Amino acid sequence: MGKVPPGVGPKYPQVVVLMGATGDLSRRKLLPGLFQLSRAGFIPGCRIIGVSRDDLDTDGFRTMARETLDRFSIRGIGETDWAAFAEILDYVPLAAGAGTLLRSVEKAEQALGGDSRRLHYLSVPPNAALSAVQLLREAELVERSRIVMEKPFGTDLASAVSLNAKLHEIFSENQIFRIDHFLGKEPAQNILAFRFGNGLFEPIWNRNFIDHVQIDVPETLGLDRRAGFYEGTGAFRDMVVTHLFLSLIHI
């Protein structure tokens, strides 16, 4: 593992509680991304606790994570890098309850030593978001924490407003990050720089010179393990009003 440049990585040691750890987004994006951060030395002093409905133990979760990396990682998996990553993985089944989750987080914090922080990443469907937040409150894991809410945030305006109000009963606004992982893709990140940092295109980037905007999503991905999610959310909410509309806003 390479040396971390000064100023790179979190200021404090982090315990990452990954809710929905065995789900599709976690398998395809989050676990491979966390592995690459670990491999590059960007998350020193980090422990990852997976939480989901699957009845696994830590060894089972590590096995699942390795299979996931072998399938979805864009780079090869070195055994030394994998061993270091596997060492920071832990797992708590949802059925084990808030007390078990708290003990697992406290154990991770003791292993890290010093002043640590908690990052709760909710990779769960909208109908499970509130119960996940309530679990964190029951486990007394709100202090010294940040919470990341993946899209879609609710299923319509009313449910989003309701979820936001209930979320504020537990977390303060400066603890909450509502995100769309699609905007983390490099082409999406580069749109603003391409538009505003380019003296050739910026002056003519307006309705007088642009005839229309077309956004293509040439994906071949099927439902796979997402049938339950799509049954309640649907492709329009999952893709159009989140990924595509947010990309359009950048344009």
Whereabouts are the PLM-identified features?
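N-terminal low-complexity, Ser/Thr- and acidic-residue-enriched intrinsically disordered segments
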Residues: 1-60
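Catalytic cores of eukaryotic secretory-pathway lumenal/extracellular enzymes that build
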Residues: 3, 55-57, 65-75, 103, ...
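Glycine-rich phosphate-binding loop and adjoining beta1-alpha1-beta2 segment
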Residues: 39-90
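Short acidic-hydrophobic, aromatic-tinged amphipathic segments that line or gate anion-handling sites
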Residues: 90-97
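Beta-loop-alpha module in the N-terminal Rossmann-like domain of NAD(P)-dependent dehydrogenases
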Residues: 99-101, 106, 111-146, 153-157, ...
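A contiguous active-site-proximal alpha/beta segment in oxidoreductase catalytic domains
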Residues: 148, 153-220
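Substrate-binding/catalytic subdomain of NAD(P)-dependent oxidoreductase enzymes
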Residues: 228-247
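Conserved small/polar residues in nucleotide/adenosyl-binding loops
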Residues: 249-251
